[in-house]
Amino acid sequence: MLLKADFHIHTREDPHDFIRYTAVELLEEAARQGFDVVALTCHNKRIHSEELSRKAEELGILLIPGVEAAIQGKHTLLLDMPYARLKVRTFDHVRALKRDGGLVIAPHPFFPAPKCLNGKLRENLDLFDAIEFSHFYTQTLDFNRKAVEYARKMELPLVGTSDCHRLWQLGTTYTIVDAAAKTIPAVFAAIRAGRVRVVTAPLRPFDRLRHGLKERRNRLRVRSEGLLGSALRFPSGAFPSIAQARIHSARGAERRLTRSEDAFR
């Protein structure tokens, strides 16, 4: 079965970012957009609960417990792993934790920010089941390109995510998973087997402006409250221009993606 999924989403319960909508409001919007699978991945906090799971089930959504953890200072998505019960701080901790299952995704791995994986992805490649294709790119500025090339080279699947911090971001980029069933094990098995495709389109200039304003508000809040900021800062400069994203499956087959695949919305 084909499942519309997003594996990287933040909500108001996130301790590191100023977000207006709650987890319940996010689930309601995801249901409105026709999502089948959602992972809530707040920074260093696993917010999954029986109440949220029941709400998701009522809405027809498979809810995957998750967290965007700072592992040796690098953002790493841990899905369906008991992060809250253990002090997971190093990649060796993640290796030990993964023996009991779960899925590990490299989020925005080559973006120009200290908290992005970059070289740590290469050093710990055995840990990662998939690489993220982030919603944050335009036709002239695209930090996903290196991730696409690296995923193809390493024969790892790409999963599209919104990294949602504002509701308008949900649905900008997502994944279609061809799973045997609508269960966490079946979804994870499909990802590992490369039975996924990314649905995406570059942000419009106005969307990028909104994104920048959001990051500025986050930084102001961080300074006023003395918190450790998690905003990504993107330097100005010339980057190769692309007119359309080219996404590669785990087997290296090139796939052009357009909004025509939005039939799943």
Question: What name fits each language-model region?
Answer:
Residues 14, 100-103:
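N-terminal processing/targeting junctions
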Residues 105-113:
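Aromatic-lined carbohydrate-recognition surfaces of secreted/lumenal glycan-active proteins
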Residues 1-7, 11, 15-28, 46-61, ...:
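Charged catalytic cores and adjacent phosphate/nucleic-acid-binding surfaces used
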Residues 6, 27-44, 102-105:
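Divalent metal-dependent hydrolysis catalytic cores, especially in the metallo-beta-lactamase
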Residues 35, 95-98:
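Secondary-structure boundary/capping motif
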